[in-house]
Amino acid sequence: MAEITRALIARIGVDIAKLVIHIHAVDAAGRRIFARALKRDQFLLWCTQQLPSGCVVAMEACSGAHHWARQLSALGFTAQLIAPHLVTPYRMEGKGGKNDATDAAAICEAACRPQMRFVPIKTTEQQGILGLHAVREGFKAERTACVNRIRGVLTEFGLVFAKSPKVLLAALPDVLEDASNTLSGVARLALQQALEHWRSLDERMQWCDRQVNQHVRDCEQAKRAARIVGIGPHLSVQVLRH
């Protein structure tokens, strides 16, 4: 790229895909300079070689965007993240349809709007604790599904328990040992496996809870949020993501 072209670039819109990154570059007046596609492993090197220092690099706040934003900021560029729903109005659906190239152009266009609200770039620590929360939520969903499966099997044998998972968890070992009920042998074995899985999920959730509680003790912002009436450790972590 000629040096004069490099100097003209004021902003680029970047669409991040799994294998290829699409770029749409404009000058200070918003005029298109070029559009191109790069392999992911070429992107940062290309930016350092072809973009002027401080150039705005706008991306949707999607999976992996915070990582790229941190990398770009460290290289001296102005990384901006935009919530996907704020980019949608700028997509030119009638001109070639929705694809990665038009998405990059839409992101570039959205970034220049004076009232645009940008997503704060998260630190690795923030993303780590949010990842922990996501894993815990996954365990929680798995546990709910496991409990429902156990209830479903028991119901087929005429065994019904109160809605409280604690009641079911306390009663299930005795139910499995009770030879007088109608449970078949294979059903008992299957439910024993499900019970062990349930307990394992409880242990994993408790581990996550300990990690979250430790984070709240160590993080002043989370500690302040947790002092608000009605906000516990997990909610205080969620508050900080915004």
Spell out what each predicted region is.
Residues M1-H242:
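A detector of single, family-specific signature residues
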